[in-house]
Amino acid sequence: MVAFHPLTVIDIRRETEEAVSILFSVPPALRDAYRFAPGQYLTLRTRIEGEELRRSYSICNELRVAVKTVPEGKFSHFANAHLAVGDTLDVMTPDGRFTAPIEPEKAKRYLMIAAGSGITPILSLAKTYLHAEPKSQVTLIYGNKSAASILFLEDLQGLKDTYPTRFSLIHILSRQPREVPLFNGRIDRE
C-alpha cells in the first residue's frame, strides 16, 4: 500500500553546483515497503514556510534521489541549501511503472537517452541491467550543459570501469565545445 512514512536523511552528496543527492535510512520494519524496482520514484513531503510541499523524484540507486535546484523551486532550493543529515522527511513508498523485466538469461542491447536530471531513473535501470543481465549491453547518450553539470559522473565512470565491454557512454554538451562536433548541442529529433 502506498503511504508516507518519516525517513531520516543519512547522506547528502553534492553532485554538481546545482544538485544534491539525498540518501534515506529505512527502519527494518519498513524495508519491504521501500523495496523498489529500477525506474520507480519517491514522493517527498515537508512543510516550508507553513506550506505543505510534495515533490516526486526518481530513485537513482539505494534509496537515493537527486534534487536539482530550479528557479522559484521552493523544495529544490530547500533541499540544496538547508536540508541536513539527520533531518526527517515524509517519504511515500516507491511508485511508478517506468520499469522493464530483468531477464538474466537473455542478451539484450539497451539504448538509453537522458538529459540533465533525467539521468536518475536511467542510472538505476542501467546499473541493474548491467549487474543482473551478464550478456546484455547498455549504450547511454547523456546530454548536459557542460562537464561540470553532469550528475553522477563518478557513478557513470564506475560503470564504464566495471563493464568496459558492455557499457558505452556518450556525453553530449550544449554549452561547452567539444573536439568532435557530433558531441556538441542538444539531444533532439535531428
Whereabouts are the PLM-identified features?
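Ferredoxin-reductase
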Residues: 2-88, 92, 144-146, 157, ...
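FNR/FR-type flavoprotein reductase catalytic core
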Residues: 77-190
